[in-house]
Amino acid sequence: MTEEQYITALTNNPHGIRNIPNPTEAMQLTCVGQNGMLLQYIKEPTQKVIETALSQAPRAIQFVENPTEELLKTLVEKDWAVLEYISDPSDTLIQSALAQSGWAIRYIANPSEELQLEAVKANYDALQYINAPSEVVQLQAVQESYLALRYIDEPSVAVLEAAVKQDPQAMRQITTLTKDLALHLFKVSAAIVGYIPNTLGVTVDEIKAIIVDAISGDTVDEDYIRELINNKAIGGRQSKWPIDLLSLIDAYGTKIVKKIAVGEYLKY
C-alpha cells in the first residue's frame, strides 16, 4: 500500500496505526489528530506529532517521555485534570491546577494542610478527596457550604457549630443529632430552631429558657437576636414553637436587645 492509501485507511480507522510498522509522520498525524490517546502506539514520535496529540487529548501526556515543565504548565492551564498523569508535579503546576478546581487535590500526593485549605476554599466538596482532613480543614469546608458535612464521618461540635451558622439546613445532615446537641446548637444559631425534629422531645420551655438567657445576658450577639426575631418558626399558636417573643424581650431583654427588636419590627 502507498502512504496515501494508508492515510485513507487510517482516516476511517485511526486505531489501525497499532498494526502498521514504522508509520510515517503523516500517518501518525492522521491518527493522533483524531484521537490523541493513540500516541501510546507510536514509537519515538516527533515533536509535531506530540503537540498534535496533546492538542486533541491533553491526557496523552502520560505517553510522553520526559516532558518539559513548560509543556506541562501549558497543559495544566488548559485542563487541571491532566495533573493526574504527571508524576511529582512542581509547586507551580499544583498551584495552577488548584486555581482552576479544588478537586485537583485528589491528584496531589500527601498534600499539606495549606493546599487542603486552598482546595476546600475553591470547592467545598474537594473534602471528599482528602484523607483524614484536620479539624481546621473541616471547618473551612463547612464554612464554604454546610453540605461538606456529607464528607465528614464524625464531625466535632465545633464543626457542627460552623455548619449551622453557615446554613441552618445543616441540621438535616447531622446523623447523630441528640436532644442535648440540638439545644446546644440552638444556642449557637437561632435559625436552626425550625429544624429540630419533634422526635427529640425538646420542649417549648427549654427553647424559651435559652431565649431568655440570650436576650438578658451581659454580652449580646446581635445577629442571634435578629435570627430570633425574624424566625417564622417562633411566634403564634400555629408556629412550631408558640412563644411570645415580644413579651419575653419586653420582660427580660436588655436595652440593646430592645433597640434591635424595635429596629427589626419597624422594617415590616
PLM feature spans:
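Alpha-helical scaffold segments
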Residues: M1-Y268
